[in-house]
Structure formats: structure tokens, C-alpha cells
């Protein structure tokens, strides 16, 4: 779905008033006497994902997930890893949550625990609960 933004720019030069219609689809430079508008829009070329959780929390959660799912040591588990992609079913997810609660000495509300699908989501929720506990 593409959206085109447009704007009208009016400049008065001596006795002429000329409205100019500019489409923002492509970069443009409009100049009139001493007046210029650079209409170049910066468009991100790459989307990057960043974790709000601390790396050490992500690492602890990853280790617990590996332990609960009996994964091999060389199995890669990172922040974006989904429990379902590791073969976890709903019972496995409950066991993961129980392991996390024990390790971090917290209690997760059932509604929030059911929404956890990735290591990152678990780590972020844990950090939130640890802060609330203090």
C-alpha cells in the first residue's frame, strides 16, 4: 500500500503568484529567487530490531529455555527465537514460565504468561516484574 503526500507551495515573485504542486514520491528541490525548499524525505533503508531487555537477562532466559526443552548446547537460542520454532507446545511453555519464575523469584500473571512467544518477550516481562518487585 503506497501513500502519496503532496503539498502546495506558493511563491510571490513581482506580479506573479504561481502555486506549485509537488509530489513527495521522489526527492525534489524547488527554488524561486532566494527561496528554496529541500523536499527530500529520508526513508530508512533497513529495519533494525532492538531489544529492550538487558543482554544478561536474555542469556539467562535462553539457558532456561534450553534446559526446559532439553535442547543441545550447540542449539542457537537468541532474543527473537520463538518457543514454537523450538518445538515447544503449551505444556512446555508453562514449564518454561515456571522455570523463569523460580530463577528470577517472580510471579507472572497467567494472562501475561500466555502471551509470551519469544525469548525477548519473556526477558522484557521478567525485567518489568523485577522492577515492580523492588
Curated annotation (Swiss-Prot):
Tissue expr: Seed.
Chain positions found as O-(pantetheine 4'-phosphoryl)serine: 90
Subcellular localization, as worded in the UniProt entry: Plastid, Chloroplast
Occurrences of domain Carrier (ranges): 55-130
PROSITE patterns: CARRIER, PHOSPHOPANTETHEINE
Main location: plastid
Function comment: Carrier of the growing fatty acid chain in fatty acid biosynthesis.
Name this protein carries in UniProt: Acyl carrier protein, chloroplastic
Gene assigned in the entry: ACL1.A3
Amino acid at each position: 500500500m503506497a501513500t502519496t503526500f503532496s503539498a502546495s507551495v506558493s511563491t510571490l515573485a513581482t506580479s506573479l503568484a504561481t502555486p506549485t504542486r509537488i509530489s513527495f514520491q521522489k526527492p525534489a528541490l524547488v527554488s524561486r529567487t532566494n527561496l528554496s525548499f529541500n523536499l527530500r524525505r529520508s526513508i530508512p533503508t533497513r529495519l533494525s530490531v532492538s531489544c529492550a531487555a538487558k543482554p544478561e537477562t536474555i542469556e539467562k532466559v535462553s539457558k532456561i529455555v534450553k534446559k526446559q526443552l532439553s535442547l543441545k548446547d550447540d542449539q542457537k537460542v537468541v532474543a527473537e527465537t520463538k518457543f514454537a520454532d523450538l518445538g515447544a507446545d503449551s505444556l512446555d511453555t508453562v514449564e518454561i514460565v515456571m522455570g523463569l519464575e523460580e530463577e528470577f523469584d517472580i510471579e507472572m500473571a497467567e494472562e501475561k504468561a500466555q502471551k509470551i512467544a519469544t525469548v525477548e518477550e519473556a526477558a522484557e516481562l521478567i525485567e518489568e516484574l523485577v522492577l515492580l518487585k523492588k
